[in-house]
């Protein structure tokens, strides 16, 4: 069953949101941004491109999506969200397709939907507590940071694969002036 999360009420210190509130907000924002980028890439790729391995030492976009589902599922959904851990990490990399891209997107979306609920419900005590995950002993804070960093890292790899395969600009920052300086 689903555990109840502690300390979820909004807390303010000197009129500002408490650090756990800021962490939850920023972690969710960055994961959602990565999710949209991955969805955009997967939608653009054909089924063969989705499972294309550039060489023996690189995995496909499809493998990376499965790997992210496994990582988020294990570290957030199972460890912090109290779901059973059925991860088979090697299978994430051994899959060669042709898993339908719709199924792949749905798996990612379902994994992240639960993770968003879990992260959104974390309180100060959850972030400070030490948890055991994948053979490591980590605080809740370290788990959230790991998942966001890991998700972003592989989102970049998925973007690179897509750009290499399709020779496109992904348009992530279309309409934004990225040459603005701090004012």
Each predicted region: which residue ranges?
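Short, contiguous alpha-helical
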Residues: 28-32, 36-39, 49-92, 133-183
């Amino acid at each position: 069953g689903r555990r109840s999360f502690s300390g979820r009420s909004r807390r303010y210190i000197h009129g500002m949101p408490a650090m756990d509130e800021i962490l939850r907000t920023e972690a969710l924002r960055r994961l959602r941004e990565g999710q949209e980028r991955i969805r955009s890439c997967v939608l653009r790729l054909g089924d063969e491109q989705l499972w294309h391995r550039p060489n023996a030492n690189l995995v496909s976009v499809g493998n990376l999506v499965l790997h992210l589902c496994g990582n988020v599922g294990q570290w957030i959904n199972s460890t912090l969200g109290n779901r059973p851990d059925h991860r088979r990490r090697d299978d994430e990399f051994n899959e060669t397709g042709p898993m339908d891209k719709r199924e792949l997107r749905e798996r990612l979306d379902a994994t992240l939907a639960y993770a968003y609920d879990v992260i959104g419900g974390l309180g100060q005590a959850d972030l400070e507590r030490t948890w055991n995950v994948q053979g490591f002993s980590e605080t809740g804070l370290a788990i959230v940071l790991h998942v966001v960093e890991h998700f972003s890292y592989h989102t970049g790899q998925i973007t690179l694969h897509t750009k290499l395969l399709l020779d496109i600009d992904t348009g992530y920052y279309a309409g934004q002036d990225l040459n603005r300086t701090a004012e």
